[in-house]
Amino acid sequence: MASQGTKRSYEQMETGGERQNATEIRASVGRMVGGIGRFYIQMCTELKLSDYEGRLIQNSITIERMVLSAFDERRNKYLEEHPSAGKDPKKTGGPIYRRRDGKWMRELILYDKEEIRRIWRQANNGEDATAGLTHLMIWHSNLNDATYQRTRALVRTGMDPRMCSLMQGSTLPRRSGAAGAAVKGVGTMVMELIRMIKRGINDRNFWRGENGRRTRIAYERMCNILKGKFQTAAQRAMMDQVRESRNPGNAEVEDLIFLARSALILRGSVAHKSCLPACVYGLAVASGYDFEREGYSLVGIDSFRMLQNSQVFSLIRPNENPAHKSQLVWMACHSAAFEDLRVSSFIRGTRVVPRGQLSTRGVQIASNENMETMDSSTLELRSRYWAIRTRSGGNTNQQRASAGQISVQPTFSVQRNLPFERATIMAAFTGNTEGRTSDMRTEIIKMMENARPEDVSFQGRGVFELSDEKATNPIVPSFDMSNEGSYFFGDNAEEYDN
């Protein structure tokens, strides 16, 4: 990992740029989302969508998925080499919903991938605009994080369902680049590494030959990404051990699971970006907003502003609560699935409830669902305040190694203290401190035992009025500390299935 001095900001990762100053970053991020908006408008024209249909989030998701699939080179190549029945490798499509005679109809559309690529490039000054594609992937990933639970995936890799707050970005595709790596949680990286090690255990040729050499490079790169997320020397030293292992096996899996648990108190730094559905950028471009001239940021007031004045609709199933559907999408837009509910509620200005209490299923509609009974409603995506997105993991007063916030991975840089029962977490650390990482394990456990739950995170950081775009007057909210702030509490969400 490069030293602090050479770190690029997320926006630079997002736009593939080298070091730029704030104005250049704002301009290149603006160019990126403006391109998404122009592409969306063009697709609505191609598909002859009405204004209302173009604002339907389900249509937005279908169009986003089409362009992501059109540019998925590895999969396209695979599909051409392994033709499967009824799948044309050169075409992409999905459900488009249209309003006909007071009812919603589903229409399955099919397009040439080449045509989609042409429209996308045309909207992006003739470039491939990979950054815009990654941006869409992160929006889909944030939506998945808010919608589904990953208990099954956690258990399969030998991790504990209580580590769900470490799983940000667990559904991001591998090709999501540096911007994707920045938003992945510690648990996500650990899970990817464990899967890799397990394949190596079961398949003797996994690390061998020319392919094995590439695999090894990928393994070490993933280790370095994970190492860069940890903020204490002992955790990083343990990652060096895992990376340098001659022949990764169960000892490494054990070390990684230990590190994932330790991240519940000694939080990793994980980026948060507000990525909005393509239709929102489309609405702004259509209303004459010049993104490149105005500039745009994924971590400031801009996304709150966008949502403040765009009207997006969603299909609603018969027994779903539209307010709950709105909460789901609001959380996805702000990458707040792992944020403390009390902080989210304060910013949003309406109570944000845990997932177990939501009467809503996912945003996407399965192809076998009955459209006869479908209704649509406006998503309420506005907020009362705005706050800066963080990447620090919520460690208190800049001590790199203090308690982050348990069972949440903070999204907003807003002062709060940390309701956590250290006993519950320390119970996960019974037993094994021997082996070659024993001294590091002992040190990590000692740091965790010394973490004080009464410490305050993000000291002095607050939320801002929407009129305060320069963030001059922070309002530091006071929270009722008695209740647990995790969104996953009493969870009954569906599992994420590819």
UniProtKB/Swiss-Prot annotation:
One GO BP: symbiont entry into host cell
Protein location: Virion; Host nucleus
Motif Bipartite nuclear localization signal location, chain numbering: 198-216
Motif (Unconventional nuclear localization signal) on chain: 1-18
GO molecular function term, any single one: RNA binding
Region listing for Disordered, in residue ranges: 1-21
UniProt key word RNA-binding: yes
Gene Ontology cellular-component terms listed: helical viral capsid; host cell; host cell nucleus; ribonucleoprotein complex; viral nucleocapsid
Record keywords: Capsid protein, Helical capsid protein, Host nucleus, Host-virus interaction, Ribonucleoprotein, RNA-binding, Viral nucleoprotein, Viral penetration into host nucleus, Virion, Virus entry into host cell
Post-translational modification: Late in virus-infected cells, may be cleaved from a 56-kDa protein to a 53-kDa protein by a cellular caspase. This cleavage might be a marker for the onset of apoptosis in infected cells or have a specific function in virus host interaction.
Main location: virion
Presence of keyword RNA-binding: yes
Pfam families registered for this protein in UniProt: Flu_NP (PF00506)
Its job: Encapsidates the negative strand viral RNA, protecting it from nucleases. The encapsidated genomic RNA is termed the ribonucleoprotein (RNP) and serves as template for transcription and replication. The RNP needs to be localized in the host nucleus to start an infectious cycle, but is too large to diffuse through the nuclear pore complex. NP comprises at least 2 nuclear localization signals that are responsible for the active RNP import into the nucleus through cellular importin alpha/beta pathway.
Oligomeric and partner information: Homomultimerizes to form the nucleocapsid. May bind host exportin-1/XPO1. Binds to viral genomic RNA. Protein-RNA contacts are mediated by a combination of electrostatic interactions between positively charged residues and the phosphate backbone and planar interactions between aromatic side chains and bases.
Family statement: Belongs to the influenza viruses nucleoprotein family.
Protein name per its UniProtKB record: Nucleoprotein
Source organism per UniProt: Influenza A virus (strain A/Turkey/Minnesota/1661/1981 H1N1)
Name of encoding gene: NP
